[in-house]
Amino acid sequence: MTDSNGQKDNNQDQAQPADPVVSKPYIMPDDPEEGTNEALVREAAEARDKMLRTLAEMENLRRRTAKEVADARTYGVSAFARDVLEIADNLQRALDAVPAEARANADAGLKGLIEGVELTERSLINALEKNGVKKFDPQGEKFDPNFQQAMYEVPDPSVPAGTVVQVVQAGFMIGERVLRPALVGVSKGGAKPAPAAANGNEGGVA
């Protein structure tokens, strides 16, 4: 009885329909190559930035090195040039020590000596110029402390105050630098220097 009922129950269970299978939409997994491509693009951009920075640093280094080499060529003779200037100054002092009257009445020997000293002094100046050292004489110019050193003032109302009226010692430039400032006498008591051209254009054509 029990077996019969049990068998009947089992048959009833098997006869019941199964739950319907609901299909879920298929979701495509992420493309594994997509992340790889983004990483490659990012790495390439970083590598490019590093390369550009390296190239910029190399270019800056090249420019600095070229400037240092150029400065060394231009200004490397500064100390030697100063020593040569002292010799030229001594030769000029020797020439200045000979009065004009003595020169006019000098015999052949003295004239030859004077001419030899003058030639030597000119040769030294020419040699300096070949090496980038140039002489400048600010006579009559407005005093500029960047290029001149004022030794004294000279009362002279005929010229604007602050004008170089006497040059005790000429100045010298090497490249764009002052190797030795000119020693000068500056006027005082004269009229004030004329205003700069920019100040005189007020109301004029721009």
From Swiss-Prot:
This protein's superkingdom? Bacteria
Per the record, the GO terms for biological process are: protein folding
Quaternary structure per UniProt? Homodimer.
Q: Which UniProt keywords apply?
A: Chaperone, Cytoplasm, Stress response
Write down what this protein is called.
Answer: Protein GrpE
Bias regions of kind Polar residues — which residues?
1-15
Q: Where in the cell is it found?
A: Cytoplasm
Q: What is its main location?
A: cytoplasm
**Pfam families in UniProt:** GrpE
What biological function has been recorded for the protein in this entry?
Participates actively in the response to hyperosmotic and heat shock by preventing the aggregation of stress-denatured proteins, in association with DnaK and GrpE. It is the nucleotide exchange factor for DnaK and may function as a thermosensor. Unfolded proteins bind initially to DnaJ; upon interaction with the DnaJ-bound protein, DnaK hydrolyzes its bound ATP, resulting in the formation of a stable complex. GrpE releases ADP from DnaK; ATP binding to DnaK triggers the release of the substrate protein, thus completing the reaction cycle.
User: Of which family is this protein a member?
Assistant: Belongs to the GrpE family.
Q: Where is this region: Disordered?
A: 1-38
**MF term (GO), any:** adenyl-nucleotide exchange factor activity
- GO CC, one annotated term: cytoplasm
Taxonomy of origin reads: Bacteria, Pseudomonadati, Pseudomonadota, Alphaproteobacteria, Hyphomicrobiales
